Amino acid sequence: MATREQAILSSSMQQPPPLGVPRPLRVVVVDDSPDFLEVICGLLRLEDSIEIVGYGTDGTQAIRVVADLHPDLLLMDVQMPYMSGSAATLIISQHFPTVNVVLMSSDDSLQTRIACKSAGAQALIYKPAFRKQFFEVLEKIYCGAGAQATVDQNESSRTQP
């Protein structure tokens, strides 16, 4: 029987796809609202270029899932019980710097934007505008526009509910 460490190690040593064949973006989704989690995952499953590899409902679970699965992207709510998304982002960005973190919030205050940026998030998506902003954010992150521009631009592209 394999130990937990062996299982984690073997799962992280998967063969890369053949050269020239892009692999799907491996995404972990974390939100304390089961309804919103279901909606977001439903939208993401429509995309062939995205593979949801894990879920969580609070910041502590986000850290554990990222440590176990090493996703390309962590999509996480800001306000959650036990540990906020911004607190989890600070830890994840220090220990797993290759994981891009995109935070989501219904709170579009300056304080929330500053907290997300300070924690190391690549972007903050305003939840009521998720559908519009998500793919714009992905393009900016993975096409090299940079985190600063992504977090700042979302302030001007938010739509009011």
Where are these regions (language model features)?
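Alpha4 helix (beta4-alpha4-beta5 surface) of REC/receiver domains from two-component response regulators
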Residues: 87, 108-125, 132-136, 140
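Conserved acidic segment of CheY-like receiver
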Residues: 23-36, 40-44
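Short amphipathic alpha-helix used as the core "switch/output" element in two-component signaling
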Residues: 64, 86-97
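Active-site beta3 strand of CheY-like receiver
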Residues: 69-75
